[in-house]
Amino acid sequence: MRSSAKQEELVRAFKALLKEEKFSSQGEIVVALQDQGFENINQSKVSRMLTKFGAVRTRNAKMEMVYCLPAELGVPTTSSPLKNLVLDIDYNDAVVVIHTSPGAAQLIARLLDSLGKAEGILGTIAGDDTIFTTPASGFSVRDLYEAILELFEQEL
């Protein structure tokens, strides 16, 4: 197998292991990769890969400190449309919630506020990566949700 293909296979295996969120030490990751047939892997290589892919230690569902990869976020470019900053749109009985790339919520909220009541938006509250939007009088939350989906060309 070519070394670049072997490297790609190693990266895939490494990322798959971290997605399991059960490895609390670099040594455990080394052993798991060796068990998958990557004999030449060592702690130093795992450490470099953790840094390269931005892995962090965090608590999993069992409250154990484990290594995991951050959510893969598309970094916006000067030519990318705003819709690429919107990651998810959902709603309940009261508000529409929009999740964005980190740092983009206030920009998207300002756009929504500029559309105003005529488009069904009473107002928005934005944090770093989350927006709460409430419908204007005469609009249902579902109507607002569908209008925002259409605006950002998201799938239902």
Curated annotation (Swiss-Prot):
Under the heading InterPro entries, the entry gives: Arg_repress, Arg_repress_C, Arg_repress_C_sf, Arg_repress_DNA-bd, WH-like_DNA-bd_sf, WH_DNA-bd_sf
Q: What is its main location?
A: cytoplasm
Q: Which GO terms describe its molecular function?
A: arginine binding; DNA binding; DNA-binding transcription factor activity
Q: What does this protein do?
A: Regulates arginine biosynthesis genes.
List GO terms (cellular component aspect).
cytoplasm
- A single GO BP annotation from the record? regulation of arginine biosynthetic process
Q: Which family does it belong to?
A: Belongs to the ArgR family.
Q: In which pathway does it act?
A: Amino-acid biosynthesis; L-arginine biosynthesis [regulation]
Read off the lineage from the record: Bacteria, Pseudomonadati, Pseudomonadota, Gammaproteobacteria, Enterobacterales
Q: What is this protein called?
A: Arginine repressor
Subcellular location, in the record's words? Cytoplasm
Got any disulfides in this one, which pairs?
A: none
What keywords does the record list, in alphabetical order? Amino-acid biosynthesis, Arginine biosynthesis, Cytoplasm, DNA-binding, Repressor, Transcription, Transcription regulation
